[in-house]
Regions:
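Terminus-proximal functional modules
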Residues: 18-285
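Fungal secretory targeting signals
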Residues: 1-20
Length: 285
């Protein structure tokens, strides 16, 4: 199985501490571009697959990457792209769709000069209908939620990002599938996100995606929550973590048998991280 990881925009980033969980999965945060690329290649050589990736511009003005890889018993063919312009993104969508792939995740961030996109693709072996959007305004995304939900689609991936000093934009991936009810929020301050988070938990909804993002000097949060049965093992979500704090949180949840499924970075008086951890069974870490 041949996998590609392509970067069109090179940047030099400050390497931050990387945390690893060995065995069935591995997780890294705060990687520079070359280290990120090397990690993907090294694990690909061992037949591991990328399950999540994200990027953000750190306080030094360089791009830092976060990465989660797993060693599943079997998986569909997959491809990754990163540091794509909007035009590159649109060309890749047409190319990969024509080859029978579907977009699993898109992550957008305000780059050093322009907005950049990361993309994770899987072979669409089950012919699942899907759709994607980038550079949507808040109003456009809100309209999309209503339209796609009405037509039986679920939000699979959501990424918020800044455009200039005053405009928030959103990238999303949708798939036509049944599933638990969802709640989606965008444009929240940290305090507003905490309020929504607490209320969602009371109502039986738990985070499956969290996307903190910068626009200008502001920090905002977007997220997807899904309803879970009372007996289900719930995910754990934390944000506002420094790199060192994230390492401690990571180690704490790893000892309890959890793994990160989302790791996202942003700037807020320095580099901060947000993550979602899910319980795994028979995981070797």
């Amino acid at each position: 199985m041949k996998i590609s990881a392509i970067a069109l925009l090179a940047s030099v980033a400050t390497l931050l501490p990387a945390v690893e969980g060995w065995g069935e999965w591995a997780s890294f945060h705060g990687l520079d571009r070359q280290t990120f690329h090397n990690k993907v290649d090294a694990y690909n050589d061992r037949d591991w697959v990328v399950t999540y990736m994200s990027a953000f511009t750190n306080s030094h003005g360089n791009i830092s990457y976060n990465l989660i890889m797993e060693n599943p018993e079997k998986s569909p063919s997959w491809h990754t792209y990163y540091e794509q312009t909007a035009d590159d993104y649109r060309g890749i969508v047409k190319y990969r769709r024509d080859l029978g792939f579907r977009l699993i995740q898109t992550d957008a961030h305000t780059g050093t000069t322009i907005n950049s996109f990361l993309m994770l693709w899987n072979a669409n072996n089950r012919d699942i209908p899907w759709a994607d959007h980038i550079n949507q305004s808040s109003d456009e995304f809100t309209t999309a939620i209503k339209d796609y939900t009405r037509n039986g689609y679920r939000l699979k991936s959501l990424s918020g990002y800044g455009f200039g000093d005053r405009l928030q934009q959103f990238a999303s991936v949708w798939e036509k599938a049944s599933g638990a009810p969802q709640r989606v929020y965008i444009g929240l301050t940290a305090a507003e996100y905490k309020t929504k988070f607490d209320q969602a938990r009371k109502d039986g909804y738990y985070p499956v995606k969290i996307s903190p993002y910068n626009f200008g000097k502001e920090v905002r949060f977007a997220g997807i929550f899904e309803h879970m049965d009372n007996n289900a093992v719930k995910p754990e979500c934390q944000w506002g973590l420094t790199s060192d704090e994230y390492v401690k949180v990571f180690n704490n949840w790893r000892k309890k048998g959890y793994k990160p499924t989302v790791v996202n970075g942003y700037r807020d008086g320095g580099e901060k991280y947000a993550a979602i951890f899910n319980k795994v069974t028979n995981a070797k870490v």
